[in-house]
């Protein structure tokens, strides 16, 4: 009777799980703009009341598995959210309506402002409330997933990596085409990592040719306009913002082979198929040849390493193509009188870590009918998800304006940044051995990370350093067929790439009103960026060990200035007809100076200057480049009843 009850209970549970599974349906569709019919990429698609969700792709398409009784919530910045009950629908296409409440907002456009309702171009605005919620170092990260038609790509996960931006609808067809950045009305050529997110009031992305026409060829790939905060009239306001968090690897990995046995099986199968199909061997002959060569050296078509212990005379892979059930992971090898223990390590686990991120910002703002004043200070201490990578940044900003006369207004905005970046990732190339992210992801799960003695203990060298397996015969005489003479994880602990520097940016303006409807504005902007990079490759291991280690120094200085003279006529006729005419002239100049030198054969491991190396690399160089742009432009805008 007890067995019957258990059987009935199991049957009921199975039936219940089947019913529950059947209640889930796969829904797909496309999200578009209700007025234009264009796709809305990266729109949020969430199951109401849960954490389940997805986003649309670049073409506005989505696919999600949801309960039949669920409700999907479609949303995107600038649009009214829409809820749709799933029911029995397999396809749900949604047309999002523009949020009309935002149309009266003033947005920053080329050389001026306009209301959203009267603006005829294509632009997206991100406010400070949205920017401050993000734990991002670069202001460009604030655009990620929040602006339709804007795609961000990064070649590595480095803290200092600068995302490439592609704006849909412009001439950009590759990540090499960057948009033009305008900060408080002036072109900005500095490092965007030097701008404190807490200082930003809004970011406007101009996406179409009409919106960017006044910037000429410079705006061909789109324009991103950054407006910094200013004080409001009223009592003094002191703001303190503190953020503490943890950085960790969040992106999911692809489903790839992680087990050593599965990797040997897959490699055996590829060799077996080759011998059968390309060389015409019989199944038995192909098995013998493939099974006997997979752990041999690369020149014999093998992987170079066998990390399994096998009974005498047995193959690692059986006739069925599966790992020998008698194989045990871990193998002791006697080589030149020294016993080594071969055991594969989890390279991903060793490469990544969780680390602390701290950010503190304080600001003081005050204003009255005549003037406003804002001062801010920020500190960021951000540690990366790999060993040896971190950054520190100090920022300060002063911004003020003064209504000297009814017809005269003046103002200034100055910012200073001091930064230090330690970039442990020697390369951002996806296939480079110096890129630890690529190295850890691509190396086969059969290879040891460390060199171990017969007891499994990690061996150390004469300097007290852990011995890493470089795949160059140092570990029991074995070599890797690929990624030989390299170990990205030891490189991040012994090598050093540090960039430190300072950045200053300042703008000023004078605005003169005359003849009631005319305004003349003079804008000036200057910027000075300087950075010093030290790149040290250790003297003991890796490709530069034969040189006794190397050190290179690079110093770059960039100075730019911008002058603008703008004359505008703004008139409202009969209450409904609004006309705005702009005439302008702009001159922009940028000079970049570079100096670099290289030496090798370091005196000691703690060398940080060229004097600490013996041999001159004979490749010291310097450079200078200049760029100048001058333009005259005009614009006329008309709207009726603000439409």
Predicted features by range, described:
Residues 1-397, 402-405, 409-413, 417, ...:
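Short, small/polar-rich motifs associated with maturation and membrane association
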Residues 347-352, 483, 489-499, 507, ...:
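Asp/Glu-centered strand-loop micro-motifs enriched in Gly/Pro and often flanked by an aromatic residue
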Residues 385-395, 401-403, 415-428, 494-603, ...:
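Small-side-chain secondary-structure face that scaffolds active or pore-lining regions
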Residues 614-633:
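Outer-membrane beta-barrel signature, preferentially recognizing the C-terminal barrel domain
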Residues 584, 633-639, 643:
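Exposed, low-structure sequence patches enriched in small/polar residues
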Residues 370-373, 407-410, 517-520, 577, ...:
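Repeated loop/turn-to-beta-strand initiation elements of outer-membrane beta-barrel proteins
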Residues 359-361, 562, 629-635:
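Short glycine-rich loop/turn motifs
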Residues 261-273, 322-342, 431-490, 535-551, ...:
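Surface-exposed loop/turn segments flanking beta-strands in extracellular/periplasmic regions
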């Amino acid at each position: 009777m007890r067995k019957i009850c258990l059987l009935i209970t199991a049957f009921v549970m199975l039936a219940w799980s089947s019913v529950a599974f059947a209640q889930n349906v796969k829904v797909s569709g496309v999200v578009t703009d209700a007025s234009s019919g264009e796709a809305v990429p990266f729109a949020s698609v969430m199951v109401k009341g849960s954490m389940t969700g997805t986003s649309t792709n670049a073409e506005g398409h989505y696919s999600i598995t949801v309960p039949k009784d669920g409700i999907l919530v479609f949303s995107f910045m600038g649009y009214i959210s829409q809820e749709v009950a799933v029911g029995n629908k397999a396809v749900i296409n949604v047309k999002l309506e523009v949020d009309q409440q935002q149309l009266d907002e003033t947005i920053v456009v080329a050389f001026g402002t306009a209301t959203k309702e009267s603006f005829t171009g294509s632009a997206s605005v991100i406010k400070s409330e949205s920017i401050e919620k993000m734990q991002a170092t670069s202001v460009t990260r604030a655009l990620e997933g929040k602006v339709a038609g804007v795609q961000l790509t990064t070649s590595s996960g480095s803290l200092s990596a600068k995302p490439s931006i592609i704006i849909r609808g412009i001439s950009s067809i590759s990540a090499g085409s960057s948009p033009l950045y305008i900060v408080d009305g002036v072109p900005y050529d500095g490092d965007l990592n030097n701008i404190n997110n807490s200082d930003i009031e809004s970011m406007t992305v101009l996406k179409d040719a009409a919106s960017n026409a006044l910037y000429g060829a410079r705006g061909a790939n789109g324009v991103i306009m950054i407006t910094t905060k200013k004080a409001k009239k009223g009592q003094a306001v002191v703001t303190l913002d503190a953020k503490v968090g943890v950085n960790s690897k969040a992106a999911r990995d692809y489903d790839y082979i992680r087990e050593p046995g599965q990797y040997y099986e897959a490699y055996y199968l590829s060799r077996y198929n080759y011998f059968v199909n390309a060389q015409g061997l019989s199944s038995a002959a192909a098995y013998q040849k493939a099974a006997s060569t997979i752990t041999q050296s690369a020149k014999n078509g093998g992987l170079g390493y066998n990390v399994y212990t096998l009974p005498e005379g047995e193959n690692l892979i059986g006739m069925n193509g599966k790992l020998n059930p008698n194989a045990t992971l871990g193998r002791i090898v006697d080589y030149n009188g020294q016993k080594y223990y071969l055991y594969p390590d989890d390279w991903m686990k060793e490469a990544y870590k969780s680390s602390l991120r701290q950010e503190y910002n304080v600001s003081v703002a005050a204003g009255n009918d005549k003037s406003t004043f804002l001062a801010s200070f920020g500190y960021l201490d951000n540690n990366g998800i790999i060993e040896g990578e971190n950054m520190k940044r100090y920022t300060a900003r002063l911004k003020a304006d003064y209504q000297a006369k009814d017809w005269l207004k003046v103002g200034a905005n100055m910012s200073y940044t001091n930064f230090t970046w330690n970039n442990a990732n020697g390369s951002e190339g996806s296939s480079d051995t110096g890129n630890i992210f690529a190295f850890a992801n691509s190396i086969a799960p059969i290879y040891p990370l460390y060199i171990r003695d017969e007891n499994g203990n990690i061996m150390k060298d004469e300097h007290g350093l852990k011995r890493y397996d470089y795949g160059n015969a140092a570990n029991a005489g074995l070599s890797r067929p690929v990624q030989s003479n390299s170990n990205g994880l030891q490189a991040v602990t012994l090598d050093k790439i540090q960039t430190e520097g300072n950045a200053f940016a300042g703008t000023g303006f004078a605005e003169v009103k005359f003849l009631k409807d005319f305004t003349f504005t003079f804008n000036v902007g200057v910027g000075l960026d300087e950075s010093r990079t030290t790149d040290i490759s250790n003297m003991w291991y890796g490709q530069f060990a034969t040189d006794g280690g190397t050190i290179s120094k690079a110093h770059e200085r960039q100075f730019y200035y911008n002058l603008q003279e703008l004359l505008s006529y703004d008139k409202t006729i009969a209450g409904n007809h609004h006309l705005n005419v702009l005439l302008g002239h702009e001159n922009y100049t940028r000079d970049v100076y570079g100096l670099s030198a290289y030496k090798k054969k370091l005196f000691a491991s703690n060398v940080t200057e060229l004097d600490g190396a013996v041999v001159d690399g004979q490749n010291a160089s310097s450079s200078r480049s200049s760029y100048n742009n001058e333009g005259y432009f005009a614009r006329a805008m008309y709207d009726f009843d603000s439409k």
